[in-house]
Amino acid sequence: MAPRCWRWWPWSSWTRTRLPPSRSIQNFGQHFSTQEQTPQICVVGSGPAGFYTAQHLLKHHSRAHVDIYEKQLVPFGLVRFGVAPDHPEVKNVINTFTQTARSDRCAFYGNVEVGRDVTVQELQDAYHAVVLSYGAEDHQALDIPGEELPGVFSARAFVGWYNGLPENRELAPDLSCDTAVILGQGNVALDVARILLTPPDHLEKTDITEAALGALRQSRVKTVWIVGRRGPLQVAFTIKELREMIQLPGTRPMLDPADFLGLQDRIKEAARPRKRLMELLLRTATEKPGVEEAARRASASRAWGLRFFRSPQQVLPSPDGRRAAGIRLAVTRLEGIGEATRAVPTGDVEDLPCGLVLSSIGYKSRPIDPSVPFDPKLGVVPNMEGRVVDVPGLYCSGWVKRGPTGVITTTMTDSFLTGQILLQDLKAGHLPSGPRPGSAFIKALLDSRGVWPVSFSDWEKLDAEEVSRGQASGKPREKLLDPQEMLRLLGH
């Protein structure tokens, strides 16, 4: 069978090979292992949650062996495909992950889609414990008329496009319009707005893809509206991202002072990070800028603004019905107090002309395998402190454990906790004590199914190729976008 990357035939067409439990698995383990028995642990997903979980396990158990399985050919998940190209400092965590992957007690297997190429049950048969750390691969749908029109994209797909996620490499967003609307007011929304409005020359030394950079050079987008259902007090972005927007070269902010009336008194008792954020918003919206800042704003050719108390109702089509030409927003007001605050429509609506609509209302996880419980409402694997409910030996960490919230350090803390819980269970004898074959059996299964796992040393070859291609244009790297090209470069 020829090597492959993108799977197109149904799982049901394969002859399933299952590792027999009990005596057969014991014999298999004895056959493949003449070394001292060690805890064999499998981690599914190589983003921050996966690597931080692996790091904790390796650090706190001197004999544990951890195998990391990843659907993509390359590691690092959202650090590679989600972090904005103009935030290289955030990507420095890759250095730590690389040291983990180079451990002689850790192995990386890319190009392996768990739930498709191998089942979770097969992993559980082969390992003492399995940790699901596969993140949130999908986006929350708007569920409004017109969402399917050309010119409407999820922010997740747009981010994947400019960051080189293979599945989004052919997105080709039309940037010939004057106005873009981003629905949602979190950090991802501000990342997308910033990339749309940043002078392309400021991005040419980043790891943004050449295709995206070329499209941004031709972009006619001059105005970006960032729309939220609730008010300033409920924004989800943080002060660093807001400050970057305010200081963005060649742009000016558009904030309505009326949106901030009475806010000064309401933030007095707020926690310090939220208070600082609100104070920056207030100053930007209500204070007269200094001479230098006023001159900068007056000369700006692009603008961005925050629209509060607006909820999307419909994407409006162009006269010929072939693409998005605007969005209808319901005016809202707030009901409730504190965390229970919710936006309710007032009955008024307004239409906002635009040619590009980007939905940034959240990511969500997908169920990975029929054998794994999944809560579709919360978008998580049901768990207690990382232990998957009713499935002994199965754990989870990161977004699939708690939902798609927080920053990388939040995921680090969460993943360390899952690792700690797993090691406690191991010490208490709650996990299988007999030998397990680990990757030896899984690699045999994958080989029988025509799947070529990509090792970490393979990734380092691809990494060197990307860095080499980037040097020609002064970039840190030029990302490889085509999985088939990657496999060819590796000789598969």
UniProtKB/Swiss-Prot annotation:
Enzyme class: oxidoreductase
Biological processes, Gene Ontology terms: cholesterol metabolic process; electron transport chain; steroid biosynthetic process; ubiquinone biosynthetic process
Annotated positions binding NADP(+): 185-188, 229-230, 241, 406
Catalytic activity: 2 reduced [adrenodoxin] + NADP(+) + H(+) = 2 oxidized [adrenodoxin] + NADPH; 2 reduced [2Fe-2S]-[ferredoxin] + NADP(+) + H(+) = 2 oxidized [2Fe-2S]-[ferredoxin] + NADPH
The entry's keywords: Cholesterol metabolism, Electron transport, FAD, Flavoprotein, Lipid metabolism, Membrane, Mitochondrion, Mitochondrion inner membrane, NADP, Oxidoreductase, Phosphoprotein, Steroid metabolism, Sterol metabolism, Transit peptide, Transport
EC number: 1.18.1.6
GO annotations of cellular component type: mitochondrial inner membrane; mitochondrion
Membrane topology annotation: Peripheral membrane protein
Transit peptide residues according to the UniProt entry: 1-32
Cofactor(s) recorded in Swiss-Prot or TrEMBL: FAD
UniProt tissue specificity: Detected in adrenal cortex and corpus luteum (at protein level).
Alphabetical list of SUPFAM superfamilies matching this protein: FAD/NAD(P)-binding domain (SSF51905), Nucleotide-binding domain (SSF51971)
Positions of FAD binding: 49, 70, 78, 114, 399, 406-408
InterPro entries noted in UniProt: FAD/NAD-bd_sf (IPR036188), FAD/NAD-binding_dom (IPR023753), Ferredox_Rdtase (IPR055275), Ferredox_Rdtase_adrenod (IPR021163)
Function: Also acts as a ferredoxin--NADP(+) reductase essential for coenzyme Q biosynthesis: together with FDX2, transfers the electrons required for the hydroxylation reaction performed by COQ6.
Subunit structure, interactors included: Monomer. Interacts directly with FDX1.
Protein name (record): NADPH:adrenodoxin oxidoreductase, mitochondrial
Species the sequence originates in: Bos taurus (Bovine)
